């Protein structure tokens, strides 16, 4: 109730017109004011005055801008003889205008449009190259970057038959594909690289494990023996199930050969149980290791795989 009384007692505040409305109002006043002096008509305006009225009567729904376009096209098609009377009339009107308004000076009005059409659609930040050379260099640079990215993806895919080993390559710090750095081959020799063929074979054996449901035993080792081996690769020999990661071979040579009998026995004896385990279990495991050893010495199957006769 009190708020209603306050609003009734307060006088209404005078509304101030905005800047755009005030400018348009002043322009309309200048146009309609009798003191404003118009420019004298030129020959085209003299000719189009009658033609515009005629065309507007014929096409009442046509916009004024479209009428102006058509009148301009028709004026250009007229010959000099047809334009001559309108040119003379424009000269007479100009002389009369100068006589009536000797102090008249044409002052063009400021245009309200701030952005031109071509400035409106230009890309910000100079994204377009200023010259052809810069444009070609930019295109070449982006094309080269795309090729390098594509080669990197192929390098990640090469040497791995299963898609699950793609992350393993980044974790092990494997260098880029040898085909990319063929000219840097002497410099990359001291670096430890992994045997691509061994990794390929082990991934195939793991896929066979997934399909058949039975573990397979891979015996792909290099000639350097136990000091170059990692614990993961030695554990894959004794365990009955294949590990998820392929064995890491730190040798730079890509040749493979079956391990000697003594080295294999030393590696297996490292994992044999001590005195706390019953003797029967130890004897059975020793018998199993001797079976693997004899199978590796006697003969291997296709691609170095062992026969599954013990299963």
UniProtKB/Swiss-Prot annotation:
It is found in: Nucleus. By mid-gastrulation (stage 11), strongly expressed on the dorsal side of the embryo and by stage 13, expression marks the future neural plate including the neural crest. During neurulation, neural precursors showing expression converge to form the central nervous system and eye. At stage 23 (early tailbud), expressed in the primitive brain and optic vesicle, with expression high in the anterior neural tube. In the tail bud brain, expressed in several patches along the anterior-posterior axis in the telencephalon, midbrain-hindbrain boundary and hindbrain. Its main location: nucleus. Keywords: Activator, Developmental protein, Differentiation, DNA-binding, Neurogenesis, Nucleus, Transcription, Transcription regulation. GO terms for biological process: brain development; negative regulation of transcription by RNA polymerase II; nervous system development; neuron differentiation; positive regulation of DNA-templated transcription; positive regulation of transcription by RNA polymerase II. Residues 18-32, 233-255 have a biased composition (Low complexity). The keyword Ubl conjugation does not apply. Residues 1-41, 230-259 are annotated as: Disordered. A motif (9aaTAD) lies at residues 266-274. Disulfide bonds: none annotated. GO terms for cellular component: cytoplasm; nucleus. Residues 37-105 bind DNA. Induction: By bmp-antagonism. By chordin. One of its GO terms (molecular function) is sequence-specific DNA binding. PANTHER family: SOX TRANSCRIPTION FACTOR, TRANSCRIPTION FACTOR SOX-2. Transcriptional activator. Functions as a switch in neuronal development, participating in the differentiation of embryonic neuroectodermal cells into neural tissues by making the ectodermal cells responsive to FGF-neuralizing signals. Downstream SRRT target that mediates the promotion of neural stem cell self-renewal. The 9aaTAD motif is a transactivation domain present in a large number of yeast and animal transcription factors. This is Transcription factor Sox-2. It comes from Xenopus laevis. The gene is sox2.
